[in-house]
């Protein structure tokens, strides 16, 4: 039973890491931003970016909508 949990946990970590790497890929980011009108739109709260498919995070320091990546995904920007 413990081995099954270990295998499932390892698979989960690999999937999370792969998703994080893919989200940081510049080509993929540019492709999504090209088709998401919310990207780089000025915002002050998360609700301002809620209509986006890829750029759903309000980056406070930039004041624009952007994607959740890396640490920002964990802390909710």
Swiss-Prot record:
Q: Which Pfam families does the UniProt record give?
A: CarbpepA_inh
The UniProt function text for this chain reads:
May play a defensive role against insect attacks.
Site annotation (Interaction with carboxypeptidase) points to 69
Q: Tissue expression, per UniProt?
A: Ovaries.
A molecular function (GO) held by this record is: endopeptidase inhibitor activity
Q: What is this protein called?
A: Metallocarboxypeptidase inhibitor
Q: Does the keyword Chaperone apply?
A: no
Q: Which SUPFAM superfamilies match?
A: Plant inhibitors of proteinases and amylases
Q: What does its UniProt record remark on the domains?
A: The presence of a 'disulfide through disulfide knot' structurally defines this protein as a knottin.
Annotated signal sequence is: 1-32
Q: Which pairs of Cys residues are joined through disulfide bonds in the record?
A: 39-55, 43-58, 49-65
The organism of origin for this protein: Solanum lycopersicum (Tomato)
User: InterPro entries under this entry?
Assistant: COpept_A_inh-like, Proteinase_amylase_inhib_sf
Q: Which family does it belong to?
A: To potato MCPI.
User: Which superkingdom?
Assistant: Eukaryota
Keyword annotations for this protein, in alphabetical order, are:
Disulfide bond, Knottin, Metalloenzyme inhibitor, Pyrrolidone carboxylic acid, Signal
Per the record, residues carrying Pyrrolidone carboxylic acid are: 33
Enumerate the propeptide ranges.
Answer: 70-77
Swiss-Prot/TrEMBL induction comment = The MCPI RNA, but not its protein, is highly induced by wounding the leaves.
């Amino acid at each position: 039973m413990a081995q099954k949990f270990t295998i499932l946990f390892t698979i989960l970590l690999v999937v999370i890491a792969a998703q994080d790497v893919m989200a940081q890929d510049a080509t993929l980011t540019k492709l999504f931003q090209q088709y998401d009108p919310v990207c780089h739109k000025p915002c002050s709260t998360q609700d301002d970016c809620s209509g986006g498919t890829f750029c759903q995070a309000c980056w406070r320091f930039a004041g624009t909508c952007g994607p959740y990546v890396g640490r920002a995904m964990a802390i909710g920007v």
